């Protein structure tokens, strides 16, 4: 073969699982996690992961394939009673495959005991890289039938590479999509071009081998079907310009004069074990193979004590459906977090990923056999100036008055906790951003490469262009990027000044006035306290504006208002029917916001086992009992994202697209909490 299987394996590791390395090193923050006692919210240590894996193997045999070993949700009451210096109650949640079935079990780390194992008949756990996808790719790319299909297109062995995708719940005429563990692979032409010589192209997704796909059974280690077809015969060209985008492959513009940020006197944040303190903010940070970075016990440390805002903040699911009914495209709708894992696909942060003054943290993940892996520099923490003052006022009344300080402004500084996941062709930054005025942002930045479809048309003047672009945009000759959506669902366990909270809609409404009133255009705000889970389902409507607020049921500010936090997010919802075969598995996208009564086991908006899952899992099940949500512990489930209509400027790598959730104090403080910043 032109490229050895070692090269193929490297490509797959980088493309799908960020190139794990079983080593330490890298720039480390001033945290000695090993020396600090573990809190209830710290990530599992390597020793804890190993202990959990060993216990499961002792019960189920050594043929276990571990999909996720992570910190189990602690009992909330017990966790909140924990004090530094005490022994925390810690458990591991373990999802694994054994004997062709999906298992889930809780392992108690303090007692070295396993709870009864739960077997799932609907839905499967995340795919593993080293245990499933990498060996599957190596096998498939040597298969004689596949090599024959490539040879028909004059593609030499090693110049084509087929990469794995999840299948959803399709192909029931060929397999059992409920119980079989499946992959669908689509193929790309990776022969090197230009200055990179014999190495494969770094633009691996730029040249699809359209009309060729493979259905593969992971546990039988067998190809189910090779589909080799294209409408109207023939195939789009694959040996086209890859538009290599790495430095050295294209002419770059003249460099800018340096624009730098520095920390000559050190950082203003401290990291103690998993706890981070900065400018009155305090939170615990951990890393999960599925969710990536997770925050716990988020709040403000004040002279009067700790004031909570949220008990936990984490992604709960991603959903990226493509909209093309072609035989090689109809199944493409990815639950990127639940199928691949935001943490498992996190890549090492380097280059321009973080500012030069950032501090980095390693994390511990695990292989498919349960072996812990120390992977470097998956988290960075840094401060930055957002470029505008946090507040400012110029009092023009006193212009020119001697001795009057009539201009006041204060520089803003923000704290950012960052990770980046590369899930196949897309790269996702997940930032938690803390401000000095009490605001906190959950920011998701999408960049990378769109899924590329090969077509006959080289320009919109070609006869096939209209049909070729029916479901997307011609972004380069013979390449269409297909229309799709990005939905990012989060779970935010709101604890505003304690666990007893209410969900309120502050509705802005026009108020009719008497005909003889001096004004006819008046609006006012009325507050609705929502009483049940079903009533709390929120679909935003620009014609009916409302502030969405989580308010304490017990605490008020100096003026007597319930202390609260407002949640702000963009309005994005599906354009298609939710009876669609992919969307009925992602019903969390039906609403911009759901609110549920807290339950320890309700963590994922599309269900615990989302790969090849059944319709209606997750949030629709959580709210089916329509529990009351007044004066109690409630959880917010916001969804953000965007409809992606591709354009030429997205090629070859898409500019960063920012979406965010804002948590903003509303009567939580008695004044602007940033008013005391020095000039």
Question: Model segments located where?
Answer:
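Short, non-transmembrane alpha-helical segments in secretory-pathway proteins
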Residues: 40-80, 128-172
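Extended effector regions of multi-domain proteins
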Residues: 109-129, 191-293, 297-439, 445, ...
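Charged, low-complexity surface segments at secondary-structure and domain boundaries
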Residues: 33-42, 117-128, 140
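Positively charged n-region of N-terminal signal peptides that target proteins for export
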Residues: 1-4
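Exposed beta-strand-loop-beta-strand "reactive/processing" segments of non-cytosolic proteins
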Residues: 61-111, 157-217, 279-281, 417
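Bacterial Sec-dependent signal peptides at the C-terminal "C-region" and cleavage site
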Residues: 12-35
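Hydrophobic helical h-region of N-terminal Sec-dependent signal peptides
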Residues: 6-12
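N-terminal pre-domain segments of enzymes
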Residues: 28-57, 234-254
């Amino acid at each position: 073969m032109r490229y050895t299987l070692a090269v193929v394996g490297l490509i797959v590791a980088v493309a799908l699982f960020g190139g794990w390395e079983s080593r330490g090193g890298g720039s480390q923050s001033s945290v000695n996690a090993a020396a600090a006692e573990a809190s209830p919210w710290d990530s599992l240590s390597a020793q804890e992961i190993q202990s959990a894996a060993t216990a499961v193997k002792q019960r189920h045999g050594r043929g276990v394939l571990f999909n996720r070993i992570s910190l189990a949700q602690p009992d909330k009451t017990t966790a909140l009673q924990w004090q530094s210096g005490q022994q925390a109650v810690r458990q591991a949640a373990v999802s694994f495959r054994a004997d062709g079935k999906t298992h889930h079990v809780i392992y108690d780390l303090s007692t070295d005991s396993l709870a009864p194992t739960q077997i799932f008949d609907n839905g499967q756990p995340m795919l593993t890289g080293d245990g499933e996808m990498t060996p599957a790719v190596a096998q498939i790319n040597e298969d004689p039938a596949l090599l024959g299909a490539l040879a028909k297109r004059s593609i030499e062995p090693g110049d084509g590479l087929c990469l794995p995708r999840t299948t959803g719940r399709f192909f029931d005429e060929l397999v059992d999509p409920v119980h079989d563990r499946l992959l669908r692979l689509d193929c790309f032409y990776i022969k090197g071009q230009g200055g990179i010589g014999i190495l494969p192209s770094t633009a691996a997704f730029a040249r699809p081998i359209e009309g060729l796909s493979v259905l593969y059974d992971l546990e039988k280690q067998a190809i189910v079907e090779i589909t080799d077809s294209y409408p109207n015969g023939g195939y789009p060209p694959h040996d086209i310009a890859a538009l290599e985008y790495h430095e050295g492959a294209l002419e770059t513009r003249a460099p800018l004069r340096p624009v730098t940020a520095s920390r000559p006197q050190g950082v203003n944040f401290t990291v103690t074990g998993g706890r981070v303190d900065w400018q009155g903010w305090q939170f615990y940070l951990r890393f999960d193979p599925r969710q990536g970075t997770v925050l716990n016990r988020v709040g403000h440390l004040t002279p009067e004590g700790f004031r909570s805002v949220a008990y936990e903040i984490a992604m709960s699911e991603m959903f990226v459906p493509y909209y093309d009914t072609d035989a090689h495209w109809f199944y493409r709708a990815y639950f990127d977090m639940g199928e691949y894992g935001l943490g498992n696909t996190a890549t090492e942060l380097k280059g321009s990923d973080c500012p030069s003054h950032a501090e980095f943290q390693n994390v511990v993940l695990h292989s498919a056999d349960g072996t812990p892996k120390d992977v470097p520099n998956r988290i960075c923490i840094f401060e930055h100036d957002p470029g505008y003052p946090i507040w400012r006022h110029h009092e023009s009344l006193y212009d020119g008055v001697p001795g009057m300080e009539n201009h006041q402004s204060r520089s803003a500084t923000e704290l950012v906790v960052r990770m980046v996941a590369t899930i196949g062709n897309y790269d996702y930054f997940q930032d938690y951003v803390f401000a000095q005025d009490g605001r906190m942002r959950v920011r998701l930045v999408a960049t990378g490469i769109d899924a590329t479809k090969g077509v006959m048309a080289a320009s919109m003047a070609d006869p096939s262009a209209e049909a070729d672009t029916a479901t997307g945009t011609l972004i380069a000759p013979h390449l269409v990027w297909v229309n799709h959506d990005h939905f990012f669902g989060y779970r935010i366990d709101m604890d505003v000044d304690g666990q007893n909270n209410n969900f309120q809609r502050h509705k802005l409404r026009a108020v009719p006035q008497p005909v003889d009133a001096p004004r006819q255009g008046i609006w006012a705000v009325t507050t609705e306290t929502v009483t049940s889970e079903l009533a709390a389902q929120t679909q935003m409507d620009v014609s009916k504006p409302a502030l969405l607020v989580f308010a304490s049921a017990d605490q008020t500010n100096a003026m007597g208002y319930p202390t609260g936090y407002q949640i702000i997010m963009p309005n994005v919802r599906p354009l298609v029917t939710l009876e669609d075969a992919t969307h009925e598995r992602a019903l969390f996208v039906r609403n911009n916001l759901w609110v549920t009564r807290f339950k320890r086991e309700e963590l994922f908006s599309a269900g615990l086992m989302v790969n090849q899952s059944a319709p209606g899992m997750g949030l629709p099940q959580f709210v089916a009992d329509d529990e009351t949500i007044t004066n109690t512990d409630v959880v917010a489930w916001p969804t953000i994202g965007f409809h992606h209509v591709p354009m030429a400027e997205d090629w070859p790598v898409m500019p960063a697209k920012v979406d965010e959730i804002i948590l903003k104090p509303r009567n939580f403080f008695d004044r602007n909490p940033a008013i005391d910043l020095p000039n």
